[in-house]
Amino acid sequence: MQSEIRDGRICVSGCVSIQTLNDKQCRLFRNQCMQPETHSIDFSGVTRADSACISLLLIALRERQGSLKLIALPESVRALAKLYEVEEWLDI
């Protein structure tokens, strides 16, 4: 997984899975969420996602109290959010 801020969006790309997500990437994502210019998270570059992506979303929710807009959230992550009954928290 890679993430970078572009035009106020955190652009997430690559595979976001429990096999690929590590502590360094989580810390970077958390710091990106805390930046005042960040207003949304764009998942359009994600090639594969599993429950690790839910963890990222919960980090964003905690850091910004749900104020970040989610763009192009993968359908697999939407399904997991529904399964875990957190879709209302994530406003999806």
Where do the language-model regions lie?
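STAS-like cytosolic regulatory interaction modules
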Residues: 1-52, 59-92
